[in-house]
A protein has these predicted regions:
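Non-transmembrane, aqueous-exposed alpha-helical and coiled segments at domain scale
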Residues: 2-63, 68-272
Length: 272
C-alpha cells in the first residue's frame, strides 16, 4: 500500500487530480449557489458563493457514487424547492441517512450541523433528504427512484463493510473485490447517472406534515443570530460594501459616535 507524499499533487493539466476527467459532464450540473452570514455576529450576506463538484470532493475526501447520488438528489430538491434561489445555509434544517457521503453533502450544502440540531438522522430515507426552511417551516423531501442503483452493487457495498467474524468475504478476497466493486460503481456512474438529469430519478415533493427526527444534540448557533439586522445607516465602515473589495485602511474612524459607543463597552452609556 502506498503512502501519502509530502508534496501535494494539487493538479494535473490544470485540473484537480481528485476529480476524474470523465466526471467533467457533472461539473455544470452539480453547481450550487449558497448564502451565509457575513461574519460570526454578522447579518446575512447578500452575495452568494458557488459550491462546485470539486468543493464537495475536497470536503468529503473522495469522489464516490454516494457523494454523486447525494449531490444529484440535492440538485433536484434545490431546483424544485428554491426555484433559482440559493441554498440559505443560515436557515435550513436537513435530515439524512447516517451515511458519510450523504451526510457530508447535506451538511455542506445546507449548513446543517449535528451540534446545532439542524442535521438529523433517519436511515429510512435511503438515498434522499428532508430539508426544512426554518423561517417558513416549508419542508421538502427528495428520494432516489427505487431500483435506479443496481442491487448487486448495494449488496457488495454492505458485504465489503462487514468486518465481523462471520463475514462472507475474507480479507484476501477483499484485496481484489474492493477494486472490482469500485470499477462497477464508476461504470454505473458513467453509463447511467451522468446520462441522466437530477430530476429524472430523484423525486421531490412538498411535505405538509413532516415528522422530523429528534436532534442528536442541540446547542445555540450564534453565527446566524443577527442575520436579519439591517445594514448601518450612520456608521461607514471601511469594510463596506464589499468584504472582498480593496484592502481597507486600519484604525478607528475618528469622531464617530458609534466608534465611541463601542469603545465604552457593551454596558456603557447608549447613544441618544
Amino acid at each position: 500500500m502506498g503512502s501519502p507524499t509530502t508534496e501535494s499533487e494539487k493538479s494535473r493539466d490544470g485540473e484537480a487530480w481528485y476529480v476524474p476527467a470523465w466526471l467533467e459532464a457533472a461539473r455544470p450540473v452539480l453547481e450550487f449557489d449558497v448564502c451565509d452570514a457575513r461574519s460570526a455576529q454578522g447579518r446575512l450576506e447578500t452575495r452568494t458563493k458557488r459550491v462546485t463538484l470539486d468543493d464537495l470532493v475536497l470536503f468529503h475526501g473522495h469522489v464516490c457514487d454516494g457523494l454523486l447520488r447525494g449531490a444529484y438528489a440535492m440538485r433536484a430538491l434545490g431546483d424544485v424547492a428554491f426555484e433559482g434561489r440559493p441554498f440559505d445555509r443560515t436557515d435550513l434544517l436537513v435530515v439524512s441517512k447516517n451515511s458519510p457521503c450523504l451526510g457530508d453533502v447535506a451538511a455542506y450544502l445546507t449548513g446543517g450541523r449535528g451540534r446545532f440540531g439542524t442535521l438529523r438522522l433517519n436511515n429510512d430515507l435511503g438515498v434522499g433528504y428532508v430539508v426544512r426552511e426554518l423561517s417558513s417551516e416549508r419542508t421538502w423531501e427528495v428520494r432516489e427512484e427505487a431500483g435506479f442503483f443496481p442491487s448487486l452493487i448495494s449488496q457488495w457495498e454492505a458485504a465489503l463493510l462487514d468486518d465481523s467474524p462471520n463475514a462472507h468475504v475474507t480479507s484476501n478476497e477483499k484485496a481484489e473485490l474492493v477494486a472490482v466493486n469500485e470499477a462497477r460503481q464508476w461504470s454505473w456512474v458513467r453509463e447511467v447517472l451522468l446520462a441522466s438529469r437530477p430530476g429524472d430519478h430523484y423525486t421531490v415533493r412538498s411535505l405538509e406534515a413532516a415528522e422530523i427526527p429528534e436532534p442528536l444534540y442541540e446547542a445555540r448557533r450564534t453565527d446566524v443570530v443577527n442575520r436579519h439586522v439591517r445594514a448601518p445607516s450612520e456608521y461607514v465602515t471601511p469594510y463596506e460594501p464589499l468584504l472582498g473589495g480593496t484592502t481597507p485602511r486600519l484604525g478607528r474612524v475618528e469622531g464617530s459616535t458609534w466608534e465611541d459607543r463601542y469603545d465604552r463597552g457593551p454596558t456603557g452609556p447608549r447613544v441618544g
